[in-house]
Amino acid sequence: MSTVESSKPKIINGSCGYVLEDVPHLSDYLPGLPTYPNPLQDNPAYSVVKQYFVDADDSVPQKIVVHKDGPRGIHFRRAGPRQKVYFESDEVHACIVTCGGLCPGLNTVIREIVSSLSYMYGVKRILGIDGGYRGFYAKNTVSLDSKVVNDIHKRGGTILGTSRGGHDTTKIVDSIQDRGINQVYIIGGDGTQRGASVIFEEIRRRGLKVAVIGIPKTIDNDIPVIDKSFGFDTAVEEAQRAINAAHVEAESIENGIGVVKLMGRYSGFIAMYATLASRDVDCCLIPESPFYLEGEGGLFEYIEKRLKESGHMVLVIAEGAGQDLMSKSMESMTLKDASGNKLLKDVGLWLSQSIKDHFNQKKMVMNLKYIDPTYMIRAVPSNASDNVYCTLLAQSAVHGAMAGYTGYISGLVNGRQTYIPFYRITEKQNHVVITDRMWARLLSSTNQPSFLGPKDVFDNKEKPMSALLDDGNCNGVVDVPPVTKEITK
């Protein structure tokens, strides 16, 4: 089988500064593939839908707030069913794998991929890969059909199991080839999608008719470009329960302080949105916003002020915040888990003890309650809005695979389903921009100090806006980065 060069970004330029960052297609390296009428044409459920099929030239802009004299900017291919497909129903042998940490909605995505393949396209052969990437070469599989997945969306976790690491490209693609699999659906975070990108490149190199599709998953909402990650709404909703409990504890005792640690290794979206939704939080600390404890304008001074004013206080901190302030023994900062993520110290316990020590030194009465709901938040079933979102992601992923697209993720951009090339979501992480309006809204809600000096403000103004926020699409057109092919095993 002849080898092919590594794929390059497919960039299509149009008038008025229009740029389409297209996704790969099987016909790019397998010319002459036959096409077939889309089975949805004969599906009674869609016979009443006018213009159900997506036009080949439809695209979705990355930014919707533009200047009248500015360029139209970057666009992505619109997701949805096409009139012609590149797989016959009996030809399809699909597989689904979940990797990385748990997230609300995993089972919903699995269910809807199976349902879409089965009910929309008449696919009969669908495999579940058990235990993450390792399952490909550990021969762990389970047959999936509509009966198996019927009610799994009501459960948390993933019925396929998951793991971190275990990525061996050659073994994985060998397994795909040996089993005759021609559609691979990979659900996972940025590390998982980097692995999916490498799998796609190897499949392309071998010249296999195999579509590789990613569905991005991260409870921290730190994947760029897309509006938000599935499971995020559920995580924020569940986080409020912990905040409410901390508030009840704090206001029920003299000088009560409730400290809640939420997920957010590098990005503080859960902490920020849970704080805004709760309205009971007096201080929110996230990785993007530096803070200090001692001295004028420090955290301790603010805590004392709040206790004097109201007699209680609720503090929310993301797990990645304050790592630079913790003990001088920073060995854990150099350790990583199997996915390559840094192992962080427990900032919640450290901050709680620091607050206790401060008040003991000043001989002030204080009662602190610490709540860590981390695994409660991510292990629950998805809520209604996330269930709908997961359905859209899964259906869009299946439509794209049947249409012959490959090497992409299914994601929401400005409220529209799109196909985004792998490199755009693995190049960097999404962060809260603390000079953005949403962070200003949080500060006005909690009345906490910004803890920012002039240098911090200047540095953060240089960062691009975050995608989830209302100002997040105002940044200009960015240069197209090279395809990333490295992966941490």
Curated annotation (Swiss-Prot):
GO terms for cellular component: cytosol. ATP binds at residues 101, 164-165, 189-192. The keyword Zinc-finger does not apply. The active site is at residue 220. One of its GO terms (molecular function) is 6-phosphofructokinase activity. Keywords: Allosteric enzyme, ATP-binding, Cytoplasm, Glycolysis, Kinase, Magnesium, Metal-binding, Nucleotide-binding, Transferase. Pathway: Carbohydrate degradation; glycolysis; D-glyceraldehyde 3-phosphate and glycerone phosphate from D-glucose: step 3/4. InterPro entries: ATP_PFK, PFKA, Phosphofructokinase_dom, PKF_sf, PyroP-dep_PFK_TP0108. One of its GO terms (biological process) is root epidermal cell differentiation. It is found in: Cytoplasm. Mg(2+) binds at residue 190. SUPFAM superfamilies: Phosphofructokinase. It holds the Pfam family PFK. Its cofactor is Mg(2+). It catalyses: beta-D-fructose 6-phosphate + ATP = beta-D-fructose 1,6-bisphosphate + ADP + H(+). Mostly expressed in roots and flowers. The keyword Calcium does not apply. The record marks 191 as: Important for substrate specificity. Substrate binds at residues 218-220, 263-265, 319, 375-378. PANTHER family: ATP-DEPENDENT 6-PHOSPHOFRUCTOKINASE 1 (PTHR45770). Homotetramer. Belongs to the phosphofructokinase type A (PFKA) family. PPi-dependent PFK group II subfamily. Atypical ATP-dependent clade 'X' sub-subfamily. This is ATP-dependent 6-phosphofructokinase 3. It comes from Arabidopsis thaliana (Mouse-ear cress). The gene is PFK3.
